[in-house]
Amino acid sequence: MASTYSFDIVSDFDRQELVNAVDQVIRDLKSRYDLKDTQTTVELGEEKITIGTDSEFTLESVHNILREKAAKRNLSQKIFDFGKVESASGNRVRQEITLKKGISQDIAKQISKLIRDEFKKVQASIQGDAVRVSAKAKDDLQTVIQRLKQEDYPVALQFTNYR
């Protein structure tokens, strides 16, 4: 039996689910009557999604479709960082949506401080873009998970590597 138990707190998303969601958005754009003739483009890059369209109204419709398709695929809305809308050639608008991955040092420090302040029997250590939480009892770790789910961080948190 292990003397200590641990898990990792990470901020990540399933890339294949995102690819599927973007493919569904593109399919929707081709079939929806109000968006069919807008010549809207949605491109998925390594770390961003680029949307080009006729107007800001159409852009907002694409946002709604993207959020809906992502939610159906169990992707958090917090992975999307919507950039500012730019003017493109020919009365078109373009927007880049950065995909957030990993926990920043500031957020990792906030999580670590919350765990240290509220749970005396639990240790938290920052490891790159993840936080490792360890304790002698599994129940303590489950309590930490429940407490962190109540907090609202600007990134989506997943709990992995539960040992």
Swiss-Prot record:
Keywords: Nucleotide-binding. PANTHER family: UPF0234 PROTEIN YAJQ. It holds the Pfam family DUF520. The keyword Nucleotide-binding applies. This is Nucleotide-binding protein Ava_2001. Belongs to the YajQ family. One of its GO terms (molecular function) is nucleotide binding. GO terms for cellular component: cytosol. CDD domains: YajQ_like. Nucleotide-binding protein.
